Amino acid sequence: MKEIFIPKECEWRFEVDEPAIQIRLVSGNAEYFGTELALGPPYHFTRVKGAIYTWQGCTLEVEGEPSVEYVAEETPMSTYLNLHFALEGLRLQAENAAANDESSYGPCVCLIGPRSCGKTSVLKILESYALKQSRHPICVNLDPTQPMLALPGSISAFHNATILDIQDADGFGASTSTGPTHVLAKVPLVYNFGLDSPLDNPKLYKLSLSRLALAVHSRMSQSKDARVSGCLVDTSSIQENAEKYQDILHSIITDFRINIIIVLGSERLYSSMKRKYADATWLSVVKVSSSGGCIDREEEWIQQFQARCIKQYFYGDDRMPLSPLSMIVDSTQLVVYRVLEASESGPKSSVLPLGFEEENTQSEKQDGNTSLRLHGKGEFLERISTEAMTILQNSILAVSSVGEDEDEATVVDSCIIGYVFVSDVDDVKNRMTLLSPVPEQLPSNALIMGTCKWQE
């Protein structure tokens, strides 16, 4: 165990893999991405790249050895604090106007930038600072590779009312589960995109985010607190030269009614946004410096992060162990869809919703040595036949909120209520072994397969 003194307005940056390290605040005050640390109790961190900042100076007790650690004197925290005060000013304006006009909204902020520029960290800081002033902005995550209160391949939103759980895998906290939580559980709204990148199927991605945006603004219209507090939208990494992503970004801005764009880590992107929205008087584009602690996330680290999120979803962690239910189901009773990439989409029909073909059409696709008979192939989904269920081995399946009798268009339009893991498939007996976080039968037999795989 060692003690680390952090001077005022400095931060201690660290990287840790395994085993976990334990950090305790001994004196002073400190915060982890905006969330204030309590004096005394230990905090456990594993497989994270983090930073603890102090405004007045503090002393930490650290047990364990981070792979990288140093104290940084130059940080952008003052800029982030000023940004928070600017957003709070807009919330006060909306609050004052709300007395006479219920349509007055607080700031709807979109954070954009290239890979590993610190967008999610800034969102956590702004969310935590807002909570300290009794504001509760809706948090939105549109990055399917870095889930928020969900599993990889999903986009989600939640109306936060409590502090973030900094020890959780994603740094936000836990959604409702079968066990107790140290911090009040969050209740997210989740849509399954199912693919790694928005560019894998831009039309499906834009459809999913439009449904999520509709729900967010429905919540804001019904709650004065949410309406005045506004929303914070985190996006996936921008590929500056990808024209399709610029189209996606425009959909995000219009669907979520964004009035502030925060650009991190790219002068070129900032100039592009300023030029593109020069005539949009309702939209402000703000350039903010990335922290010097931002580190490129290697593909291996992203995969480990996703695996940790999946494991925690089913088995919990050291603070809250969970026991998932292993169930054997009749695969003939399930309706399983596979999410299509744009290059795989079937021809669009002008008379059927969302581009789906007639149910009696069939297409065959070769996947290695397995012949897949996939029914009703459409623009976004294709139904997997019982004979082809072996491809589900080790897959994470999203459980749709609609029943198996609904058509594919309704499934695409609907949110999901959870996930199951396919641990075994017996194509001879038409049986499938599923791991479920809930000790009861599946609430819906309509399941969706994306690209997410996991090895227990």
From Swiss-Prot:
> Mind naming one GO cellular-component term on file for this protein?
nucleus
A GO term (biological process) for this protein?
tRNA splicing, via endonucleolytic cleavage and ligation
Q: Quick check: keyword Metal-binding in the entry?
A: no
**Protein name as it appears in the record:** mRNA cleavage and polyadenylation factor clp1
User: Can you tell me which family this protein belongs to?
Assistant: Belongs to the Clp1 family. Clp1 subfamily.
Give the top-rank taxon of the lineage listed in the UniProt record for this protein: Eukaryota
Q: Which gene encodes it?
A: clp1
Report quaternary structure and partners. Component of a pre-mRNA cleavage factor complex. Interacts directly with PCF11.
Q: Localized where?
A: Nucleus; Cytoplasm
Among the GO molecular function terms of this UniProt record, one is: ATP-dependent polyribonucleotide 5'-hydroxyl-kinase activity
What is the protein's major site of localization? nucleus
Q: List the disulfide bonds.
A: none
Look up and give the organism this protein is from.
Schizosaccharomyces pombe (strain 972 / ATCC 24843) (Fission yeast)
Keywords from the named record: ATP-binding, Cytoplasm, mRNA processing, Nucleotide-binding, Nucleus
One short Pfam name that applies is CLP1_P
Free-text function comment from the UniProt entry: Required for endonucleolytic cleavage during polyadenylation-dependent pre-mRNA 3'-end formation.
Keyword Nucleotide-binding, does the record have it? yes
Amino-acid positions noted as binding ATP in the UniProt annotation, renumbered to this chain: 11, 49, 116-121
